């Protein structure tokens, strides 16, 4: 039975969030609604989730000693990773010592790098994936590309938001793609995955919730990527009953293997009735921001319920919905957003501004949300809203 105490008192139920981006911010808001005391931790001050948490700490998230010190001082009931770049070996140690890591420390460790999760999916679970090789050197990488053929995709084994990811179309791209992958890895230069290109029709995120009552699948989320980073998403993505059933089978297998409770974002490629596993995040997914307008309980609310052991009897979908990112390019520590009235002038629209403290280059600073009679109309409406927002540096 779940019991939640009073925040900032001896009975408080404490959650420590590792990583404080826009997704973490929404998770904190949902936990706050349930009377949970939230401690936010990230590598920079005034990160979005810190702005709505009870208190915060700034540390190097890859420093296991610093991470352990904060966790031992705060004594949280739940440790909730919101990003991949964390000292996961320390989380494994802490879990073995009795701390509760969401969904599990093993899940955060396996999904922190593409090799762990790919080997689990393809080699242990025998799920369909693209053909792949791993390489540590330019020589091995060149051999892998020759073996897989063109086109193929290269990514650092440890990166996020498309950093270091390239599509190789010919030998002319070989050196450039290698250099870009070496620059884009979270741990600096290192290992890469080379994947044979799948001729898919579309890709989806199947948001999957493991909770006290079992596993619940949300309506599939379609999305459009540029340079590995999401630009817009929509729900539901139309797909054949066979493809949907296969997507749910793959998602169930992966999330069961990872274990624990919480929401997972399972990324899949689809062509006709065929489905291939791509990646999984053991936490809310950026493409799932659309659920802020498409569902009665967003992915963030569902994650909070699952973490706390609360039931999820039903997930109500409000109809065709879409999200479009606000993705400016510039430099500022005091960004402003104007023309919001125009952006919100149509019915069934909403905006989330993330409150990121600075921009230096291209950065996702917000998202526009819309509902309509069809997915196409919702996408067009969300895009109109996003384009109406004027970003001032």
Curated annotation (Swiss-Prot):
The pathway it acts in is: Purine metabolism; IMP biosynthesis via de novo pathway; N(2)-formyl-N(1)-(5-phospho-D-ribosyl)glycinamide from N(1)-(5-phospho-D-ribosyl)glycinamide (formate route): step 1/1
InterPro entries in the cross-refs: ATP-grasp, ATP-grasp_carboxylate-amine, ATP_grasp_subdomain_1, PreATP-grasp_dom_sf, PurT, PurT/PurK_preATP-grasp, PurT_C, Rudment_hybrid_motif
Task: Name its GO BP terms in alphabetical order.
Answer: 'de novo' IMP biosynthetic process
Which domain of life does the UniProt lineage start with?
A: Bacteria
Entry keyword tRNA processing = no
Q: Which UniProt keywords apply?
A: ATP-binding, Ligase, Magnesium, Metal-binding, Nucleotide-binding, Purine biosynthesis
MF terms from GO for this chain are: ATP binding; magnesium ion binding; phosphoribosylglycinamide formyltransferase 2 activity; phosphoribosylglycinamide formyltransferase activity
Q: EC?
A: 6.3.1.21
Q: Which family does it belong to?
A: Belongs to the PurK/PurT family.
Q: What is this protein called?
A: Formate-dependent phosphoribosylglycinamide formyltransferase
Species source reads Pseudomonas entomophila (strain L48)
Q: Which gene encodes it?
A: purT
């Amino acid at each position: 039975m779940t019991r939640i105490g009073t925040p900032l008192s001896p009975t408080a139920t404490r959650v420590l969030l590792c990583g404080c981006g826009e997704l973490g911010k929404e998770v904190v808001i949902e936990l706050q609604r349930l009377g949970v005391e939230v401690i936010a931790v990230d590598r920079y001050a005034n990160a979005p989730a810190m702005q709505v948490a009870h208190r915060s700490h700034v540390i190097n998230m890859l420093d296991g000693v610093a991470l352990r010190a904060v966790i031992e001082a705060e004594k949280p009931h739940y440790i909730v990773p919101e990003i991949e770049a964390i000292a996961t070996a320390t989380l494994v140690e802490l879990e073995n010592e009795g701390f509760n890591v969401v969904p599990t420390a093993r899940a955060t460790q396996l999904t922190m790098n593409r090799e762990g999760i790919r080997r689990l999916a393809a080699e242990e679970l025998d799920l369909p994936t693209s053909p792949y090789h791993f390489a540590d050197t330019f020589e091995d990488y060149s051999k892998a590309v020759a073996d897989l053929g063109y086109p193929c995709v290269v990514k650092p084994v440890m990166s996020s938001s498309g950093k270091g990811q390239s599509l190789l179309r010919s030998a002319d791209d070989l050196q450039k793609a290698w250099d870009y992958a070496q620059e884009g890895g979270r741990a600096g230069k290192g290992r890469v995955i080379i994947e044979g290109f799948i001729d898919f029709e579309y890709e989806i995120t199947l948001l999957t919730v493991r909770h006290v009552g079992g596993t619940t699948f949300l309506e599939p989320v379609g999305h459009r990527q540029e340079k590995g980073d999401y630009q817009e998403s929509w729900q539901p993505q139309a797909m054949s009953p066979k493809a949907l059933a296969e997507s749910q089978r793959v998602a169930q297998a992966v999330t069961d293997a990872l274990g624990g409770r919480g929401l997972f974002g399972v990324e899949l490629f689809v062509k006709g009735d065929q489905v291939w596993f791509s990646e999984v995040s053991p936490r809310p997914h950026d493409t799932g921001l659309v659920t802020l307008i498409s569902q009665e309980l967003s992915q963030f609310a569902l994650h909070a319920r699952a973490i706390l052991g609360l039931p999820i009897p039903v997930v109500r979908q409000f109809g065709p919905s879409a999200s479009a990112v606000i993705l400016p390019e510039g430099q500022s520590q005091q960004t402003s957003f104007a023309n919001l009235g125009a952006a919100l002038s149509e019915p069934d629209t909403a905006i989330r501004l993330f409150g990121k403290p600075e921009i230096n280059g291209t950065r996702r600073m917000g998202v526009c949300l819309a509902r309509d009679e069809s997915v196409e109309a919702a996408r067009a409406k969300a895009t109109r809203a996003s384009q109406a927002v004027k970003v001032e540096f």
